[in-house]
């Protein structure tokens, strides 16, 4: 299985065996992270792999999902850092799936407060992982997701590649399965919106921003597999408009 196949097959796993993951695979996770690119340049991240097979580690706080291992991703605290972190961590989640391991995004309270910072970096997200007690994959039809017709407004008939990108987006995991995204679809571009929340700043909340990073990770993996030259751009003309029930995030545009 490669990352593209994992986009459609991966499911969140919450029950793990206490078996050890081989040192070779742990090292391959580090190497994959070191070689990958983030969504935005200039945002520093750091990945820490935490082992918890004996469940007596001093780093543990309250954990609703108990796993033998956790990936902790730290980031410099700057604009779009959470979206970038979501993008990076979803790439790692897909990689773990491709190596036969289950994973699940979990809350910050898994780690004790003293470990939620690392130098000048803040903890952005956590991923529980290990060998799954059951299946770590599922068919796309079994995913509990809204249909594309509920998520999209089609301004033009989409090409096949556009439909594949949208399906990858539809299958993206999100906190509490909130699926906050909405899409306005044209022949060669997708304008991505968030459901509007009551934020005084007019900015996406950090959790929502993380969700969109996960979404864009799925879309870019599929774009690369299909050899599509795609840009993620924030268009000024879209950003300046007022939308009563949604908030503009980014546009996915196919280069000519």
Question: What kind of feature is each model-predicted range?
Answer:
Residues 1-256:
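Acidic, surface-exposed loops and disordered segments
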């Amino acid at each position: 299985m490669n990352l593209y196949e994992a986009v459609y097959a991966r499911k969140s796993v919450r029950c793990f065996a206490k078996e050890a993951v081989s040192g070779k695979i742990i090292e391959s996770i580090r190497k994959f992270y070191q070689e990958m690119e983030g969504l935005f340049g200039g945002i520093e991240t750091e990945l820490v792999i935490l082992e918890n097979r004996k469940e007596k580690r001093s780093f543990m706080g309250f954990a609703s999902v108990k796993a033998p291992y956790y990936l902790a991703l730290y980031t410099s605290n700057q604009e779009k850092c959470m979206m970038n972190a979501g993008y990076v961590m979803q790439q790692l989640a897909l990689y773990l799936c491709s190596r036969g391991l289950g994973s699940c995004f979990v809350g910050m309270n898994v780690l004790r407060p003293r470990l939620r910072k690392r130098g000048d970096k803040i903890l952005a997200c956590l991923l529980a992982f290990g060998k799954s007690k059951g299946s770590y994959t599922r068919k796309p039809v079994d995913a509990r997701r809204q249909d594309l017709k509920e998520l999209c407004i089609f301004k033009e008939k989409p090409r096949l590649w556009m439909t594949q990108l949208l399906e990858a987006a539809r299958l993206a995991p999100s906190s509490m399965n909130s699926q906050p995204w909405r899409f306005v679809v044209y022949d060669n571009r997708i304008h991505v919106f968030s459901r509007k929340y009551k934020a005084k700043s007019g900015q996406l909340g950090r959790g929502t921003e993380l969700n969109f990073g996960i979404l864009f990770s799925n879309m870019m993996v599929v774009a690369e597999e299909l050899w599509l030259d795609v840009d993620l751009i924030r268009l000024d003309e879209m950003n300046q408009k007022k939308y009563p029930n949604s908030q503009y995030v980014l546009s996915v545009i196919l280069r000519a």
